[in-house]
Amino acid sequence: MENKLLSSQEIQELRKSLPTWEEAEGKLVKRFKFTNFIEAFGFMTKIAIISESLSHHPEWTNIYSEVIIRLSTHDMGGITMLDYKLAKAIDAIKYE
């Protein structure tokens, strides 16, 4: 599958299967809350392994038990199928 910049219409259609993610400033964005820092960091570690396998890495912020993830394909200038694929994988980790 070719990685191309998705249109607004394509993003809205794909977001139907990612209802807890928002689109903001050309990125897919989601805030995750955990019980403590260890859980949050463990979650980030799992994402790091998947991200490395996809060669696609999130922009993220971690403050204690909260992780905010922003996904976009920087070299494409917006959201691509790679971001969608990573978002789906992240949700699978969180809700496994």
UniProtKB/Swiss-Prot annotation:
Disulfide bonds: none annotated. The keyword Lyase applies. InterPro entries: PCD_sf, Pterin_deHydtase. It catalyses: (4aS,6R)-4a-hydroxy-L-erythro-5,6,7,8-tetrahydrobiopterin = (6R)-L-erythro-6,7-dihydrobiopterin + H2O. It is an enzyme of class 4 (lyase). Transmembrane segments: none annotated. Keywords: Lyase. Its EC number is 4.2.1.96. GO terms for molecular function: 4-alpha-hydroxytetrahydrobiopterin dehydratase activity. One of its GO terms (biological process) is tetrahydrobiopterin biosynthetic process. Pfam families: Pterin_4a. Belongs to the pterin-4-alpha-carbinolamine dehydratase family. PANTHER family: PTERIN-4-ALPHA-CARBINOLAMINE DEHYDRATASE. This is Putative pterin-4-alpha-carbinolamine dehydratase. It comes from Prochlorococcus marinus (strain SARG / CCMP1375 / SS120).
